[in-house]
Amino acid sequence: MKKNLLFVALLLAMSLSASAQYKGFSFGFKLGPNFDWVGSKTGAAINQGTKTGFDVGVVAEYYFAENYAIVTGVSVDFLKGQYNFEDMRNISAIDTITDYQLGTVGRQFKTTVYEIPLMLKMVTPQLGNLPLRAYAQVGGAFGYTQRVKVMDTFTLGDINDTDFRATKGEYNPFHASLRIGAGAEYTLLETTRVFAGLYFSHDFLNSISRGGLVSSNYEKYYGGDKELGEREFKLNVLQNRIGIEFGIFF
């Protein structure tokens, strides 16, 4: 994580120290679908397929050289995910009696993230006689998770209980990711361009909040018959996504 952050910071520092001969600002809008999945450094959280979300936002870019720009903005990202993990749950129907059993928890979640990207954009010269240019971007994004909806399904033999819903407090409110992308832009008028691109985003921060996973139904994280410690360290859920974006600059 530290090496990735250092790499991004170095790129941005180099770009800011470059010549300011080609200064210029552009503003615009973008939107598009994203395809989300989760990873886990420990392997304790097992991804259960790719989910489809959506991004929408405003973008701004500052050209500090003819073919180089700093890109930022604000986006609202609607993200989804699903993963399984083993854990103990109290399955007793009597309040005064506890009966913790090891089963499989299937977790589905939806989050709304307000995100500010900070990217270095590198653009090619015009391709042939067409007003078309290709670009690549690298940088990071930082945001805040405003809303989380989570549903857990606990499975143990014939038991399939979907009543328990995790709370927002179980998820980290802060969001930071590495992002790379590429695409093309087409000039319609002197100051108007449309663009389409593809990007990949990988989280730096564990999505599970420290200390947020203690509830009346779950104890500490379990694997097999051994207690492995606090769940936020063992699950270590990282959000990944590939997005397609379409937009316009004015």
Feature names for model-found ranges:
Residues 39-45, 82-89, 147-159, 208-215:
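Outer-membrane beta-barrel translocator domains and adjoining extracellular loop/strand segments
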Residues 29-33, 56-62, 74-76, 116-122, ...:
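Residues on the lipid-exposed face of transmembrane beta-strands in outer-membrane beta-barrel proteins
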Residues 46-101, 114, 248:
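Glycine- and aromatic-enriched membrane insertion/assembly motifs of diderm outer-membrane
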Residues 20-25, 67, 125-133, 188-193:
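Short loop/turn motifs that connect adjacent beta-strands in outer-membrane beta-barrel proteins
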Residues 175, 180, 185-250:
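Predominantly the C-terminal beta-signal and adjacent terminal strand-loop region
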Residues 41-47, 101-107, 163-170, 228-234:
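Extracellular loop and loop/strand-boundary signature of outer-membrane beta-barrel proteins
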Residues 25, 50-54, 110-114, 132, ...:
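Residues that define the transmembrane beta-barrel architecture of outer-membrane proteins
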Residues 20-59, 241, 247-250:
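Short glycine/proline- and aromatic-enriched beta-strand/turn motifs that initiate or cap beta-hairpins
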